[in-house]
Swiss-Prot record:
The chain crosses the membrane at residues 19-39, 51-71, 76-96, 121-141, 149-169. InterPro entries: YciB. Belongs to the YciB family. Its main location: membrane. Keywords: Cell inner membrane, Cell membrane, Membrane, Transmembrane, Transmembrane helix. One of its GO terms (cellular component) is plasma membrane. This is Inner membrane-spanning protein YciB. It is a multi-pass membrane protein. It is found in: Cell inner membrane. It comes from the Bacteria. Plays a role in cell envelope biogenesis, maintenance of cell envelope integrity and membrane homeostasis.
Length: 178
């Protein structure tokens, strides 16, 4: 249920964009994101920091996009959020000597410190890649192509990164000796 709830604003954004354009899609995205945050707060008692960052960014840049009827603000949001996530992971690892990805997954999974560090760097690299691909597509392709990329391309990239992470973690899981 929680994962499905996270996709609803994006699905609504894509649908309204195709029917009515960027201004209405941005307004729909802002409203759906606020409703999503309220549901998460009521149903689960809290909202994760990552979701708060995304929610604030969606509302801020979505309102700018709606007000100016200009997609570039939502395009900036994607770039800025991914840059922020990469910076947080890199600062955690190199300044505070803590791979922050461990805080997300470390309760369920035990890995050696070097594995956490590589995983942390991998996700930081993934966020930088998403940021760069977003910049490229937003600058060199049409608004329609960018909306398709934002709606489906980033999801595909994230699923692939998650699959690679799972394969990487699997190498460190205890092996049964039957």
């Amino acid at each position: 249920m929680k994962q499905l709830l996270e996709f609803i604003p994006l699905i609504l954004f894509f649908t309204v964009y195709k029917l009515s354009g960027i201004r209405d899609a941005a307004i729909t995205l802002v409203i759906a994101t606020i409703v999503q945050m309220l549901i998460l707060r009521v149903k689960y008692g809290k909202i994760e920091k990552q979701q708060v960052i995304m929610g604030v960014a969606v509302v801020f840049f979505g309102l700018l996009t709606a007000y100016f009827n200009e997609v570039k603000y939502l395009q900036w949001k994607v770039t800025i959020v991914y840059a922020l996530f990469a910076a947080i992971l890199l600062i955690g690892q190199f300044v505070f000597k803590t791979p922050l990805i461990r805080k997300l997954l470390g309760k369920e999974i035990e890995l050696p410190d070097t594995a956490w560090q590589k995983l942390n760097l991998g996700w930081a690299g993934f966020f930088v890649l998403c940021m760069l691909v977003n910049i490229y597509i937003s600058q060199y392709y049409s608004e329609d192509i960018w909306v398709d990329f934002k709606s489906f391309g980033i999801i595909g990239m994230t699923l692939l990164a998650t699959l690679i992470t799972g394969v990487y973690i699997y190498r460190y899981l205890p092996k049964d000796k039957d």
